[in-house]
Amino acid sequence: MRGDSFIWSLATAIPLLSTAVESLKVVKRDNPSVLGFDIERFQAAKPVHRDIIAKRASTKTISQDLDNQKNLYFCNLTLGTPPQTIRAHIDTGSSDLWVNTAESRFCSSRRAPCSQGGTYDSSSSSTYQLVNNDFNISYVDGSGATGDYVTDVINVGGIKLKDFQFAIGHTSSSPLGVLGIGYEAGEAQVTRSGDQSYPNLPAALVKAGHIRSNAYSLWLNDLSASRGQILFGGIDTGKFQGKLQTVPVLHTSRGDYTSLVVALTGVGIRTGSDGSIDTFPSQPVAVAMDSGSSLSYLPDALAAKVYNSVDAVFDPANNLAFVPCSMANDKRKLVFTFSSPQIAVGMDELVIDLGPDANGNEATFRDGSKACVFGIAPAGSSISILGDTVLRSAYLVYDLDNNEISIAPTRFNSTETNIMEIGTGENSVPDATGVPNAVTSAQVTQATGLPGVETGVPGSRPPSSKAAGQAKRPDFVLGVAAVGLAGAGMLFAAM
């Protein structure tokens, strides 16, 4: 993030809801073992740029900043004795907490870019201990963070953990640190150095007895909402419709679970009032369910079919598609299927307003209509990702103990709350059912280009003669505007 942007603050300790999944026991208790945070929005800048950069990363472990095109999702926490306040991105796609230090070249620059996120000073903490110097997360362009693994006291959501391991970024290029909550096997010291894993935040909460299972639920709410919610060790049945349906997380060819990846078995568009869906032909695709990615990334051929269905125009210079901003009022929905459960995503969640550039100019098409980014991008040779443009329309339960993800349609802006605790074991629960014969393997992304999709240099063609709502090329170069799009993207742990 560079400049102003929307940030979501996960700050308040509240009773949390347990996510129900096939192998989890969900229990209604008067005092559930759940840790929860409200997710609050804060103005942030350039939510798309680092998504674009990060997609070029060459390493295998994903780490993300939780930007959702306009929004970052972050939590307030403290580290050390006495406490030092930090804002860190909540990220299901990575596994380490890392924070900046004020002495880094990036943070000590004249613009003081790290003042918003806060920094950690190990010399000011009486409980600091050095672990090793193996921390290294990097972007493909050489940016990222390197430094030390340390232990210290952490306080998050009113819960204090002693001797908690995290990383200090002595060299970094991000003004905000990252709170990764993925698999321990995805930690940078494991993937880079082959060292043993350590208990990251969800695992440490289990170890300390604050929650019963290494599982959490995520409710991002809609694009314009001021609050969402994450619950460690619980679910909130007031935040989703119907029943949770559980699908397996896919493992690597070695049988390891390192990323929260499931099989996407279908993508289509719902066009009629009868609810019928026109499905785009495709084989099952392995997709990361990654709240840290602003955009969603599909295999090139599948992205091309989506673009053609909504008359989007692709800009290869920025790896983005554009549509008229008026498409946000379109009633069609993209539908994503996972063996059985579906996420139906409205156009109002997929059409992203760029806002003005540094000179106050807004992107427009040659006919004068305002141009917006479409929230689906081609994955190229990288893994496919369902980011915030899709995940906002779902209620998700990430069960790392049982290697499952449960999915239900979200209830946008719901004020209803019903907290349930996630227990342990393999008993089925009323709020979640396993999907029979769920797909357990899927192909990885292959770069094929975008056959049949209209492309071109901005301003290179006249206004389209097609039906109203078709995207036309913006009439000024979008390189600057697109930089303002990219906010936080995915980090890849260096291998």
Curated annotation (Swiss-Prot):
EC class: hydrolase
Cell compartments where the protein resides: Cell membrane
Residues bearing glycans: 76, 136, 413
One GO biological process term: proteolysis
GO cellular component: plasma membrane; side of membrane
InterPro entries assigned: Aspartic_peptidase_A1, PEPTIDASE_A1, Peptidase_aspartic_dom_sf, SAP-like
Residue ranges of domain Peptidase A1 in the record: 73-408
Lipid-linked residues (GPI-anchor amidated alanine): 467
Entry-linked SUPFAM superfamilies: Acid proteases
Segments for region (Disordered): 448-470
Alphabetical keyword list: Aspartyl protease, Cell membrane, Glycoprotein, GPI-anchor, Hydrolase, Lipoprotein, Membrane, Protease, Signal, Virulence, Zymogen
Leader peptide range in chain numbering: 1-19
GO molecular function ontology, one term from the record: aspartic-type endopeptidase activity
Biological function: Probable GPI-anchored aspartic-type endopeptidase which contributes to virulence.
Family: Belongs to the peptidase A1 family.
Name the record gives this protein: Probable aspartic-type endopeptidase OPSB
Organism the protein comes from: Trichophyton verrucosum (strain HKI 0517)
Phylogenetic placement of the source organism: Eukaryota, Fungi, Dikarya, Ascomycota, Pezizomycotina
